[in-house]
Amino acid sequence: GKYMYSDLGFVFLKNIIERITNTSFDDYCNNTFYNRIGANNTCFLPLNKISAKNIAPSAYDAIFRKDTLKGMVHDPIASLLGGVSGNAGLFSNANDVAKMMYLYMNNGNYAGEHFINKETIDLFSAKNNKTNRRGLGFDKPDLKNKNLSPACYSASAESFGHSGFTGGLAWCEPTNKTIFVFLSNRTFPDE
């Protein structure tokens, strides 16, 4: 069959986590991960926590919100869900993103504390079928056609990461313990 990218599973994952934990998704993420690893600039709805002057605009939305999106999620599904979703809406800086990638690269451990089982990280960072290079949660390098790969030519098969529509990219190379984070606002002012 034909491969088509979809992030709807992560939209539903938010609801599943909320139902199982009886906690809002943003509180769950903050209390389970971000606060515990010192990712103090990572949050949903950043205008409630971070000064607008420290947030880059992501786009001008001429259709739906008719405003410059600064501190507001770009993704329309996440926006309709109030800005907190499993597929989009998380704001951060490079240092905090690197902390999360370090946690993934180190089998779910950060600063001597265990957060995620290695088997879960392996499941989300492995290719899930032969027709595309994506895993359940992360992208993989395209080793057959490096011109189409989201990673550099020297990326190993073990590397994984994800790029965002608005211009963010985080990549992890477990083979040589390297993390790459690039944050931009490529969709501003026009997509």
Where are these regions (language model features)?
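Glycine-centered small-residue hotspots that permit tight backbone geometry or close packing
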Residues: G71, G164-G167
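A short acidic/small-residue loop/turn micro-motif
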Residues: R186-P189
